[in-house]
Amino acid sequence: MSGDKTIQFDPVENKKTLTKEILTKVYNSLLEKGYNPVNQLVGYLISGDPTYITNYNGARSLVIKLERDEILEEVIKSYLGIN
């Protein structure tokens, strides 16, 4: 890496990217185990019960790293096309 350029850290974009990466991994893990990923994620988001999420591929450990309200915030922003 060259010392000529300063890289800016954007915590908002970083959170958005991290949330998307984690949800994608969790979704794929649920799908691989034969679950309906959308139903399982909705169950988790509504109840807060992490047992809706499989332990397969560490999916449960990943999803609990995120606050449920922050997940919902990112999902709503994405749905409405708001950055």
Swiss-Prot record:
Family classification:
Belongs to the UPF0297 family.
- Tell me what organism the protein belongs to: Clostridium botulinum (strain Hall / ATCC 3502 / NCTC 13319 / Type A)
One Pfam entry for this protein is IreB
List, alphabetically, the InterPro entries matched. IreB
Protein name per UniProt? UPF0297 protein CBO2563/CLC_2434
Organismal lineage:
Bacteria, Bacillati, Bacillota, Clostridia, Eubacteriales
